[in-house]
Design a protein with these regions (language model features):
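Residues that scaffold, gate, or flank divalent-cation-dependent active/transport sites
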Residues: 79
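Hydrophobic alpha-helical transmembrane segments of small proteolipidic membrane proteins, enriched
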Residues: 1-65, 83-165
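Cytoplasmic juxtamembrane regions at transmembrane-helix boundaries
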Residues: 160-176
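Cytosolic juxtamembrane regulatory segments of multi-pass membrane proteins
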Residues: 59-69, 173-176
Length: 176
């Protein structure tokens, strides 16, 4: 029902508020990371086979495949397709690595809040200190969860990319 949806949104909003502004950065990085992972999976599923088959057909249509020039053409064709296969994989890896770093930044920001409360209240305001501790731990957890999920996605797309690149190279023989 609508009340359940509103209650869920309220819970998410409370979680985001308790994690501080760094949590929104982690969420944005995670969204970009998973968008790129899904884009790669879509490319591998929908487009890559046509690209590889077209490249192999073009190579096999060549009358001469053994000369040095043919070898250079083959290498260029493989490189062109491999570049398409590996597009954004480095960006995905970088985003995976950034997630826990932003989590640690959230920890630092939260601990600064704890120390500010400690300095102003002399340790008497435990509730405010707990808010700072929460703000310190939630981004760390979110960054780690995002990074762990990203490692799985990144590993899958990298394995597919490596396999498809190797298969392309194996299928473009030089024996005519």
């Amino acid at each position: 029902t609508m009340n359940d949806v509103l209650a869920a949104l309220s819970t998410v909003e409370a979680f985001v508020d308790s994690g501080g502004p760094i949590l929104m950065v982690i969420a944005a990085v995670t969204c970009v990371m998973w968008t790129l992972i899904f884009e790669r999976l879509w490319f591998y599923k929908a487009t890559l086979r046509k690209t590889i088959n077209g490249t192999i057909t073009h190579w096999n249509a060549r009358a001469e495949q053994k000369s040095w020039n043919a070898h250079q053409i083959r290498t260029a064709m493989i490189s062109r397709v491999t570049e398409q296969i590996r597009l954004n994989l480095d960006v995905i890896g970088t985003l995976v690595a950034l997630c826990p770093l932003f989590g640690l930044l959230g920890t630092v920001v939260g601990m600064i809040e704890v120390f500010n409360v400690l300095a102003t209240s002399g340790g008497a305001d435990a509730k405010s200190m707990a808010g700072g501790v929460k703000q310190a731990t939630i981004p760390t957890m979110a960054g780690m969860v995002a990074a762990i999920s990203g490692v799985f996605g990144s590993t899958i797309v990298n394995q597919i990319a490596n396999r498809e690149s190797q298969l392309l190279e194996d299928q473009m023989t030089m024996d005519h």
